[in-house]
Swiss-Prot record:
Protein's pathway: Mycotoxin biosynthesis
Stretches that traverse the bilayer: none
Its EC number(s): 4.2.3.-
Lineage top rank: taxon: Eukaryota
The protein's role, per its UniProt record: Terpene cyclase; part of the core atranone cluster (CAC) which products are predicted to catalyze most or all steps of mycotoxin atranone synthesis, starting from geranylgeranyl pyrophosphate (GGPP). The initial cyclization of GGPP to dolabellane is probably performed by the terpene cyclase ATR13. The Baeyer-Villiger oxidation near the end of the atranone synthesis, which converts atranones D and E to atranones F and G is predicted to be catalyzed by the monooxygenase ATR8. Of the CAC's other predicted gene products, the reducing PKS ATR6 might synthesize a polyketide chain.
Identification of the protein by name: Terpene cyclase ATR13
Pfam families: Terpene_syn_C_2
């Protein structure tokens, strides 16, 4: 599939990014409606099996769903699954970073248990086993079973990798969510494992049907490091206000965020600390583009890794553009998160509403790709 068939090119300069992602390519998936569908199917499952989810996830009816903006290269028939999995992570990760318990924290008890006991193949994401409420416990298990079914019946190898990343992130966050750090480098090394950059990468690789070997990861490790750093700091920059308000509400003095750390390190206010983080983000973004260019020139035959690094470029630009006005971080853009209005707004944003269902459009693109493979080299998205 040609990239132009499944995504549209955007200009970073059209968005108020404050200098972030300034020299980055930006695209948005044409099958964004499926990402919205996946998010709301996940939320409907939580309502049915656990309780009413009040937090916001990946939807952004103004700039675009996080899957559409950060993963424009994934296969159309995997967009909805990616939306479902990512929405679960959003609900789950908020429990990782707050002190919510009981009905407000859908996965809180299971996170604690997962830290103590690890995550097994039969309890792939650590959901449900610790909850004392039978309905909630069984509901979380239902969600977990559904996620594993969706992943493994689509791509078993990528599913296994994603499960491993989730498990590692769970343990890292619970053990270190309030720890102190002495240097930015020390914090970034932690944040790479904690902030979801590796999880987002795992969802992206699943969506692309791209499996990396251990050697692949070793070969690209130094190149991709500043990309992970930029992603972690971008998350901190845009989520700080939300986390700061939550910390004041709960009395939690410490939380893992680079802005909060610079406030302590430099004895400064939030605005000045955010400016330091913004400049660090821009520097890591610049470094990643330079290292990526050097890697491609030095490894002209490593086409799989070229594709991976290209996809990670969109992770950076997409996260910045999504974060600017996503309801998850920005109270002024909030609405009923369970209303399901995003696809209606999406149609209005694009100025048209196709009469074709997404499934029909996917079949048409697959047919074009099949014909292309019979007549010449296949186009790889």
């Amino acid at each position: 599939m040609a990239l132009e068939e499944i995504s549209e090119r955007l200009q970073v300069s059209d968005f108020p990014t404050l200098g972030m992602a300034a020299n980055y390519d930006l695209r948005r998936h044409k099958f964004e409606s499926l990402a919205n569908d996946g998010s709301h199917e996940m939320r409907a499952d939580v309502r049915r099996w656990v309780g009413n989810p009040s937090d916001f996830g990946g939807c952004n009816p103004i700039n675009g769903h996080i899957i559409a903006l950060t993963m424009p290269m994934i296969k159309p028939d995997r967009v909805k699954i990616a939306g479902y999995i990512y929405e679960c992570w959003f609900l789950y990760s908020w429990d990782l970073t707050t002190t919510l318990t009981g009905a407000d924290g859908f996965f809180h008890d299971d996170i604690l248990e997962g830290t103590n006991e690890g995550v097994s193949d039969t309890d792939a994401f650590g959901l449900g086993t610790a909850d004392q409420d039978a309905k909630a416990r069984d509901g979380r298990k239902q969600i977990q079973a559904k996620m594993m079914y969706l992943l493994e019946t689509t791509d078993k190898a990528c599913a296994k990798h994603l499960q491993k990343v989730w498990s590692n992130m769970l343990v890292t966050t619970i053990q270190h969510k309030s720890r102190d750090f002495e240097t930015l480098k020390e914090y970034i090394d932690f944040r790479i494992r904690d902030c979801g950059a590796l999880f987002g990468e795992g969802v992206m690789l699943f969506g692309m049907g791209l499996a990396l070997t251990e050697k692949d990861r070793e070969d690209v490790a130094s190149t991709i490091y500043p990309c992970y750093a930029a992603l972690g700091l971008t998350n901190d920059y845009f989520s700080f206000d939300r986390e700061w308000e939550e910390a004041k509400r709960t009395g939690e003095a410490k939380f893992s965020n680079a802005v909060r750390l610079f406030m302590d390190w430099q004895s400064t206010g939030a605005a000045a600390a955010k400016e330091v983080v913004r400049k660090a983000i821009i520097e890591y973004e610049r470094e990643f583009l330079e290292l990526r260019e050097k890697f491609v020139k030095a490894n002209p035959k490593a086409e799989r890794l070229h594709k991976f690094l290209e996809a990670m470029v969109y992770q950076i630009s997409g996260h910045v553009v999504w974060s600017i006005n996503c309801p998850r971080y920005n109270p002024s853009f909030r609405y009923d998160p369970n209303s399901g209005v995003e696809n209606q707004v999406l149609a209005e944003r694009r100025g048209k509403s196709s009469s074709k269902k997404p499934s029909v459009m996917i079949e048409e693109i697959d047919e074009k790709s099949h014909l292309a493979s019979e007549t010449g080299p296949a186009m790889i998205a």
